[in-house]
Amino acid sequence: MPIRHALSTTNIALVAVFAGLIAASTLWPGAELVSGVPITLQTLAVLLAGAALGPWRGAAAAAVYLIVGTAGAPIFAGRSGGFAAWTGPTAGFLGGFVVAAFVTGWLVRSMRTRGQLTTTGIIGACAVGSLVVLNVIGWGFFTLRLQTSIPATAAIASPFLAGDIIKVFIAGTAAAAVHRAYPQLLGSVRSTARATESPAPVVVAATAGGNSVS
C-alpha cells in the first residue's frame, strides 16, 4: 500500500474507529474460566476489523489498540492496561490479534479481488483468523509460558470453542453487511463481486475513468 494512500484521512479515521471498537469490546465484563483465560468480545472486534478493512488497516487497528493499552489505558480484558498484560500466559492472544486481523483481511481481500466475495467466504476467513491463527498463537504461548502439555492445553481450550465459533459467524455476517453497504471499502475488483449470496448482489464494475457501482 503506497504511503500516501495509507496515511489518507479516510484510512486514519477507519483505523481509529476500529481500534476504538476493539477497545469498546472490553466494556462487557466477560467471564473467566478456571484456566484464567477470560472470555471477551475482543476476538469478534478484531476479526471484524480485518474482514471489513482488509489486511493492513485491520492489523493497524489491532496494533493501535495494543499500543494504547500497553501505554496504560485500561482497555485490555478485565479493564486492565499497561505492560504487565504482556507478562502473563494470555499475552499470546494479544500479539495474535494483529496477525489474526491481517490474515483475515488478506483472505477477504483476495476473494474480493477475484470477484468471489460471499458471506460464506467471509465467515470462512474469520474462522481461519480465529480458530487457526489466533488459537495457535494464543494457546501455543499459553503452553510454553505455563509449561503445560499439549493435551492439557487442549482440555483447557475446549470450553472456549463454542463461543469462538459464534463470534466467527457474527463477525463474518457483520463484515458482509459492511461490504454490501460500502462495496468500495477494499478497493477495485477484477470482475463482478458479491458481498453476500443474496439474489440481488452488489456489482462493482471497473471503467476506464475509475470505478462505477451499479
Question: For the regions a protein language model found, what residue spans apply to each?
Answer:
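Hydrophobic transmembrane alpha-helices
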Residues: 1-59
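Interfacial aromatic-anchored transmembrane helix boundaries in multi-pass membrane proteins
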Residues: 26-38, 66-100
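Membrane-embedded alpha-helical hairpins and interfacial helices in multi-pass inner-membrane proteins
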Residues: 35, 111-205
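Alpha-helical transmembrane segments and their lipid-water interface positions
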Residues: 61-65, 73-76, 104, 137-138, ...
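Structural signal for the C-terminal ends of transmembrane alpha-helices
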Residues: 52-56, 103-111, 178-182
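Helix-loop junctions at the membrane-solvent interface of multi-pass transporters
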Residues: 28, 52, 78-79, 107, ...
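Short helix-perturbing small/polar motifs within transmembrane alpha-helices
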Residues: 24, 83-134
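Hydrophobic alpha-helical transmembrane segments
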Residues: 12-17, 40, 44-48, 59-64, ...
